Regions:
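Acidic, His- and aromatic-enriched active-site or binding-groove loops in soluble protein domains
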Residues: 1-4, 64
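Active-site core of metal-dependent hydrolases
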Residues: 8-138, 144-145
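Alpha-helical elements of the RecA-like P-loop NTPase motor core of helicases
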Residues: 51, 183, 211
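Short secondary-structure capping/turn micro-motifs that flank functional sites
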Residues: 100-101, 179, 212
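His/Asp/Glu-enriched, well-ordered alpha-helical/loop segment
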Residues: 117-204
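C-terminal cap of metal-dependent C-N hydrolases
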Residues: 192-227
Length: 227
């Protein structure tokens, strides 16, 4: 379920009891339906941003892995907290918001490297585009003064930047946007190239441009041309 906004002035500010009940419902629904039953959490700019999740876990039988917090690179202090949180729970970084707010946002490719250096398991790190999501800009009084939109293509740009600028192996960068996401969300037919799974394949040239693309076994792009 989700996204559920917490630690954000735009959220409905769910109480600990409400959050527990909501995520417990997601868990039970996942068990009955053979799905992950995970709760995607929109993380806001409030201080101590993970506190609502910690409180829910401390007052229930829920585990940190039942929560999937996103926008964890939106400012320096949430990112620092994510380094500790990510050792036991999952951490999702947002690709499309940088360089929209470069004074606050942590560059997502750099964030991947820093999380790994801090001891966060690779399998706990994901990157999503938040494509078509809103990128609001507020003044000091909290008034909305402008609005932009995240782009789906940002995820590809960040993945390439992780390899070319941050010098991570391609297989590491690819895992953050493929197999890690599929494993956490239990998307059994996604995230890997194996017999019996959906044949979703992106082929890149030496300059990391998409030359060919296959979706569920169907050729969608061949020799740089969309079919």
């Amino acid at each position: 379920i989700g996204e559920i906004a917490i630690s954000d002035h735009r959220s409905s500010c769910p109480s600990t009891a409400e959050l527990i009940r909501l995520v417990e419902h997601a868990r039970v629904g996942g068990m009955l339906g053979g799905k992950a039953g995970i709760a995607n959490m929109h993380m806001g700019d409030a201080r101590d941003p993970f506190r609502p999740i910690y409180d829910a876990v401390e007052n229930s039988e829920l585990k940190l892995t039942q929560f999937f917090p996103t926008h964890c690179n939106r400012n320096p202090y949430i990112f620092e907290d994510a380094k500790a949180y990510g050792k036991k729970g999952y951490v999702d970084l947002t690709a499309s918001s940088y360089p929209y707010d470069p004074e606050n946002e942590i560059k997502p490719s750099k964030a991947i490297v820093e999380l790994l250096s801090a001891g966060v398991p690779l399998e706990h790190i994901t990157l999503t585009s938040d494509g078509n999501g809103s990128l609001p800009n507020f003044d000091r009084e909290g008034r909305l003064i402008s609005m932009d939109m995240g782009l789906p293509k940002s995820i590809m740009s960040v993945m390439i930047d992780t390899v070319t600028e941050e010098n991570l192996p391609l297989e590491t960068a690819v895992a953050v946007v493929t197999s890690n996401v599929a494993s956490i969300l239990r998307l059994r037919d996604k995230g890997r190239i194996e017999p019996g799974k959906d044949a979703d394949i992106v082929i890149l040239d030496k300059d990391y441009a998409i030359s060919d693309l296959i979706s569920r076994g169907q050729m969608m792009t061949r020799n740089y041309e969309r079919l």
